Amino acid sequence: MSQSGSRLFTSESVTEGHPDKICDAISDSILDALLTDDPRARVAVETLVTTGQVHVAGEVTTSAYADIPKIVRDTVLEIGYDSSAKGFDGNSCGVNVAIGAQSPEIAQGVDHSHEVRTGELSDDEIDRQGAGDQGLMFGFATTDTPELMPLPIALAHRLSRRLTEVRKSGVLPYLRPDGKTQVTIEYDGDKAVRLDTVVISTQHAADIDLDNLLTPDLREKVLGSVLAEIDMPELDVSDIRLLVNPTGKFVLGGPMGDAGLTGRKIIVDTYGGMARHGGGAFSGKDPSKVDRSAAYAMRWVAKNAVAAGLADRIEVQVAYAIGKAAPVGLFVETFGTEKTDPARIQQAITETFDLRPGAIIRDLDLLRPIYAQTAAYGHFGRTDIDLPWESIDRAEKLRAAAGL
C-alpha cells in the first residue's frame, strides 16, 4: 500500500576496493574465465581476503582450466591495490586455492529435474534442468528514476563509481581504493522530493587535510559531478548535508583494515533495502544457481511490468525447490500503485515469462562471461554497462496480456 507523509530513506554503496567487493570481483572473474572455455561449467567460488592473503575455496565441475592465482593477482591489481602502503599488494599477496568438485547429489537434480525423473514433463532441454537449490528470490522496479530503480541506491552507486573514476583517472590521485557512500532521500508519500544527506568515506594517502582538501574536492569532483549528470529537475538538491570521513582520517583500508568475504554486500548488490531479499548472494555462482539467475529474472519481470505501465512500483517473488524445474510459487506486490487488478498482473507475468531455470538461462543468454562487470556498483539499474535483465523487451507483450 502506498504511504503518505514525509519520511527519509537511506541506501549505501561501496567501491570496488572495499574488502568484500574485492572478493566478489575475484569470485566473478574466476567464473568468467571458466565460462569462456566451458559455458556449462558448474561454479561456486568463495573468496576471503585479509592482511596479505587471499583464500579461494568452493566447488567447480568443468572441462576448462583457469589460472586462479593469476586471476586473483590481476583482479587485485586492476582494482588498484599495488602497494602495502595502500593496504594490499596484488604482486606479493599470498594466494591459497582449495577447489573441489560439485556434489553429484546436487548435480543429478540440476541435470535431470524431478519432473523429468518422475515422468511429469517431457525430457527436453528446458524441462530437464532443475533448480540448483531451494530458495526465494525477489525483483523490484519503481518509477523513481529513468532506469526504474530506487533513487537512494541509484545515487549511492553513482557516487561510488565516481569515487573510483577520479582515483583511477588521476583527478584526485591521493585517493585509495577502499570507500563507501550513503544517500538519504526525503520522500513525500512515494515521491522522492529532496536529497537530504550524503556520506562519503574514502581511503586516502597520509597527511591529507580533511577539511581544506578532501571535503572540497569530493564536494566538487564527486558529488557535484554526479548531480550534474542526473536528470531529475524536481529533486531538491539545494541544501545537502555532506559528511566526509566522519571518523577523521582513513589511511588504513582494504584487507589490512578489514577482512572481506564474497557475498557479504547483498543489499548493496540489489535495491539498497527498499525491496525484500531472499538471502542468496550472486558472485562466484554460475547461472544454474537460481540465487543468481532467478534474481536477475525477477528484476527483468519487475522492470518490464513497470515499463508496461502495470504499476508504478512492483515487487515480485519467485520460489524454487531443489531439483524441480517449475517454480513452486510466484507472488506480486504493487503497493497500491497498480493500474489494473493485481491478480491480472500476476496472470500476465505467468503468461509472458517462463521462469524455469533453463528458460531463464536461455532467454537472458546467461552462459556467457558477463559477471565480473557486475561485481561492484550493483547488479541492477546499471547505466554504464549493458545487462540482459535490464531489457524491457517484454513490456508490450506483458501490457497486452494484462489487457491494457
From Swiss-Prot:
Cofactor binding note: Binds 2 divalent ions per subunit. Binds 1 potassium ion per subunit.
Disulfide bond annotation, renumbered to this chain: none
Primary role: Catalyzes the formation of S-adenosylmethionine (AdoMet) from methionine and ATP. The overall synthetic reaction is composed of two sequential steps, AdoMet formation and the subsequent tripolyphosphate hydrolysis which occurs prior to release of AdoMet from the enzyme.
Protein name, entry field: S-adenosylmethionine synthase
Pathway involvement of the protein, from the record: Amino-acid biosynthesis; S-adenosyl-L-methionine biosynthesis; S-adenosyl-L-methionine from L-methionine: step 1/1
Molecular function GO terms recorded: ATP binding; magnesium ion binding; methionine adenosyltransferase activity
Alphabetical GO biological process terms: one-carbon metabolic process; S-adenosylmethionine biosynthetic process
Cited HAMAP family: S_AdoMet_synth1 (MF_00086)
